[in-house]
Regions:
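N-terminal glycine-rich FAD/FM-binding segment characteristic of electron-transfer flavoproteins
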Residues: 1-305
């Protein structure tokens, strides 16, 4: 199970004891068994759902929600998931909130906290009507404790002829490499303008990330310079992340970058400029040259080697 799915289940469990996990795709035995450790499972297992076609998955989610009289639909805040449940919200006529990072129940009313205006503020909102559709930041909630006895797994019938066909699946290029996705990782190591080329970025940012089992991220400056791919960009025009630990290496702290990571639980920064804006947001800061400090950190983490 991906960490983001665990976060969605964790949020749902905090809100209600009566939850069900809907699993979609093909050949789902392994993920069904994993999901059943946390909640009863409805398994939508069909070849027509094997490909990541959002309108088909949204159709199934909406049909199941109607059949189950669901009051709340929860998913993780990935680009893919928001595309799917956003469509489902439209089909169901429900209200939706994305990127939720916290909540509270007040007199039976669910109040949600989410960043707005590029992360400048955290707003508390209340959704009206039913069902309510919510996506939560992957690192905002922990997966609940697994049950001693697995919950039941119930297959659901899929009418392939009733699925939308407006979008046809062609191909999928899967990401290669052992590092986790930057939007779901519990630790993110990001590099900024201080790194002069892609080799230096990989040696320092990638090296520290590998020592920590972390994902790598990048500032917009490195993407614009062609040093890192767009898929690594963290910020207002890139990925929005909120890991348990965010390490900013040679990143000054431009507003557009802060918008993408300021809700991280712990922020640590290394920058040779003591007046860099990133230090105003960092929980821990080290004034120094990343070319000197990062190799020392990597060596310590690797047992002094």
């Amino acid at each position: 199970m991906r960490p983001g799915s665990g976060a969605a289940i964790g949020f749902a469990r905090e809100v209600s004891e009566d939850i069900t996990a809907l699993v979609l795709g093909e050949n789902l035995d392994a993920i069904n068994a994993e999901s059943a450790k946390f909640a009863p499972v409805l398994a939508a297992d069909h070849p027509a759902l094997a490909a990541p076609v959002a309108d088909r998955w949204a159709h199934v989610i909406a049909e199941v929600a109607r059949a189950q009289n669901a009051e709340l639909i929860v998913a993780t805040s990935t680009t893919w998931a928001k595309d799917i449940v956003g469509r489902a919200a439209g089909l169901l006529g429900g209200a939706m909130a994305s990127d939720v990072i916290g909540h509270e129940m007040v007199d039976g009313e669910l109040r949600l906290r989410r960043p707005m205006f590029a992360g400048a503020v955290n707003a508390t909102i209340v959704l009206e009507g039913s069902p309510q559709i919510i996506t939560v930041r992957p690192s905002a909630y922990d997966a609940p404790e697994s049950a001693d006895t697995p919950f039941a797994i119930e297959p659901i019938a899929i009418d392939a002829d009733a699925l939308p066909n407006a979008t046809q699946f062609e191909s999928l290029d899967r990401k290669t490499g052992a590092r986790p996705d930057v939007t779901e990782a519990r630790i993110v190591v990001s590099g900024g303008r201080a790194f002069k080329n892609s080799e230096d970025f990989e040696q320092h940012v990638g090296g520290l990330a590998d020592a920590l089992g972390a994902a790598t991220g990048s500032s917009r400056a490195l993407v614009d310079a062609g040093i890192t791919p767009n898929s690594l960009q963290v910020g207002q025009t890139g990925k929005i992340v909120a890991p348990e630990l965010y390490l900013a290496l040679g990143i000054s702290g431009a507003v557009q970058h802060l918008a993408g990571m300021k809700n991280s639980r712990v922020i640590a920064a290394i920058n040779q400029d003591p007046d860099a804006p990133i230090f105003e947001f960092a929980d821990y800061g080290l004034v120094g040259d990343v070319y000197e400090e990062v190799p020392r950190l990597i060596a310590e983490l690797n047992g002094g080697q």
